[in-house]
Each structure stands twice: as C-alpha cells, then as structure tokens.
Amino acid sequence: MSYTLEEILRIPALLENLKDFKFDFSKDKSYLFVGCGSSFNLGFIAKTLLNMNGYKADVITSGYVMLFNKIPKSDVAILITRTGETTETVKAAQTIKNFGIKTIGITCAKDSTISKISDESIILDFAEEKSVVMTGSFVLILALLVNGINKYDFSEESKKVLNSSTEVIDKLDLSKYEHFVFLGYDENLGVSKEGALKLQEMALQYVEYHEPLEYRHGPISRLTEKTLVVINSKDNLEEKKLKKDIEKLGATTLEISFQGEIKVPNFNGFEIPLRLIPIQYLGYKKAIQMGYNPDTPRNLSKSVKLE
C-alpha cells in the first residue's frame, strides 16, 4: 500500500485523537493564517469559516510576507507548516514577531524550527506523513481549527464519508478524464482550490477551480466529454441547475453535498474537513491510473527550503 493511501485511510483514527487537543478562537481578537501551498489553502478555508461566523480573520501566503514585509492588522498569527521547516513560513514567523504579533505554529513535526521560534506551538506529531503530498494531516489540522469555533466528533462521520468516497470513485473510469474542474462557494471554494492542487500534485493533471455560477462566464468553453467536474455543493437550486447544464454538454459531474453522489453531513459549513476526503482519494486514484507514484510527485519535495 502506498504511503498516500495509508495516510488517507487513517483519517478517522487521526480525528479520534482530537479529543486530546484544545484550541479556541475569540471574537475579541483578529487572526491571520499564514502558509504555503496546501497550508495556505487550509488557512483560506479556516479564515472563510471564521468570517462567516462573526470572527475577524485574514489569510496570506508566507511568501508574500517574506518578500514584501506587509502584514494585515491582527492580534494572533497562526502559521501552518506540516514539516515545520518551510523556508517562507519560518521567515514569515520571524517577520510577524518583529511586528509584535503573537505567533502560534501548527506542525506535525517534533523539534521543528517553527515550533522553536513561535510564541506557542501545536505539535501533531502522530499525524506526521511520509508522503510528499499533504492529506490526512490537512483534514486533522482543519478539524482542530473548526473545533475552535464549534465542537464536533468528526471521527465517526469521517468513516462514512471515506466509505462513500471509495465506493463512488472506484466505480469511475478515470482513464476517460483529462480535465478536472472543482467548483464551490465560500469555504467550499477553498476545498476546490485544494482539490485542484491534489490533482496537479499527484496526477499531473490540467485543473481549474471556480465559484459555481462563475463557471458559465468563460471557463465552461473548455468543457468536453473528457472533463470531470467536482461540485462541492451547498445543495441550492442554482448549483443543481448548473450540474444539469454541465451534464447536457457531455461532461461528468461528481457532487459532494448533503444529497450528492458522495454525501457529507450538514453541519452548517462545519462539516468542511470531511469534504477534503473524497478529493484526496480522487487525486490518489487518478495518479495510480496514470501510472504515477503519488508518494513522490515529480519536481516536489516534502518541504520547500530556499537557499
């Protein structure tokens, strides 16, 4: 079994360990999420969910902080780096500290640089991954942050979503598809962005991500029978109309929603960690179908370190 698959399948076990961790957000403080790649996408989702629930939050790439020394006004910066060694994030942490902002590092590595330089750190070393691609640890960290707003037992629900994901995706003839599109609003746009990244990283595919109703305004011109459109839906009527329109044009749709082909529970947006499971598994399956090793994608390393 590949490391990537193993790290996806162990997600329910990872989530079971959340009971040992506590992280609470306050509406009296403003938060800034900082990260690169998947960690930035994670911060984007968390920031969006916080804003939707009356909290003040922003998100920025570590590289932007490193290059331009500009930081949105905030009380607490949450720096996410799976390895704790990503150059841009480590340098961003030091810059942010120089601005007098409290820093919290979230990582899956013991004794990492980010945990040493941050004012506080959350170390989820039981979720450390051997694969280059971030999967289970992404779901875990996002669930930790979600529980900082509202508490949920994601472990049992994740088993259901994982079973549904493997059952549905295993039936797809992925060799038919050469173009992948991910659609979603609000926090689901962040999931779509991450879904696109998973297909790029693991399976080297041509991908797009958009808000659903924006898709008709140009991007739909590339739609063919070789396109798979993944809709992270909020189960509204207009998204359902779009799904039918896409199918009429010959493409295939895969809906992840409360009533979709892959079902997730309705937690008013807080189910968001569970929506990552099917897109991660889809990336893995497409990589295998293409004959690629999802554990070690081309041109990528587990941690980006700049000279």
Segments from the language model and where they lie:
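Acidic catalytic cores of enzymes that act on phosphate-bearing nucleotides/polynucleotides
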Residues: 178, 182-254, 262-263
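Glycine-rich phosphate-binding loops that contact phosphosugars or nucleotide phosphates
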Residues: 23-159, 165-166, 185, 228-262, ...
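Glycine-rich phosphate/diphosphate-binding loops that line cofactor/substrate pockets in enzymes
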Residues: 17-31, 168-177, 223
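A general structural motif
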Residues: 15, 160-168, 207-217
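A cross-family phosphate/adenosyl-ligand binding-site feature
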Residues: 1-14, 104, 129-137, 268-277
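A short, charged, Gly/Pro-tolerant segment at domain boundaries
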Residues: 290-307
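An N-terminal, well-structured beta->alpha segment
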Residues: 1-29, 162-164
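Structured C-terminal subdomain patch of bacterial secreted/periplasmic proteins
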Residues: 264-293
